[in-house]
Amino acid sequence: MRCCIRLLPVLVALGMVPLTVEANEPGLTPAEVVRRYSRTVACQIHEATPGYRQYATVTLRPDSSDGTLGVWLVGWTGDLGCLGGNATHLVQMTLVEQRGFSRRVVSPVVIDHDPLPGLVLNGLRDIQFSNGVLTVRGTTGRQAFGTFQEITLRYRYRDGWEHRDRRFELLP
């Protein structure tokens, strides 16, 4: 009983301390969100090398005046799922959105880890977005095997909730 009486002030004091638990660290850029995400879902993630990009980011929809609703696409290369075989180190595109709160409160979140249909590249040269069209420049194959190719793919971006299942359409 005496032990409980001595412990009571400590428990009361602990109950008065505000405990803050956040699952989302505020203030991160879309590229940093994807950098952290990629390290949890992939292996063999290397820094950019000359002529190739890593964590290249394009803005698809700018933040609104209150700092919400921005949408970005971040391109990176790695072995998604850590499969560890030939041709498993590929270009990945990750769609990120700032939802509901400004970046001061929460960072953007990953909303789609595979938004681009038909994208199979093993090197990312560049991504650009202009007038609703996303251009992805990259490489496939290996020079040592004589299969190396430079590839350019173009996608139409369709914004809005009604297109959430198919935001990008591969253009001819």
Regions found by a protein language model. Name each.
Residues D66-D79, Q128-G138:
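Acidic/hydrophobic-patterned starts of short beta strands in beta-sheet-rich repeat architectures
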Residues D79-A87, G141-T147:
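Short consensus segments that form the blades of beta-propeller domains
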Residues R104-H113, R164-L170:
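Beta-propeller fold detector
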Residues L7-V17:
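Bacterial N-terminal signal peptides
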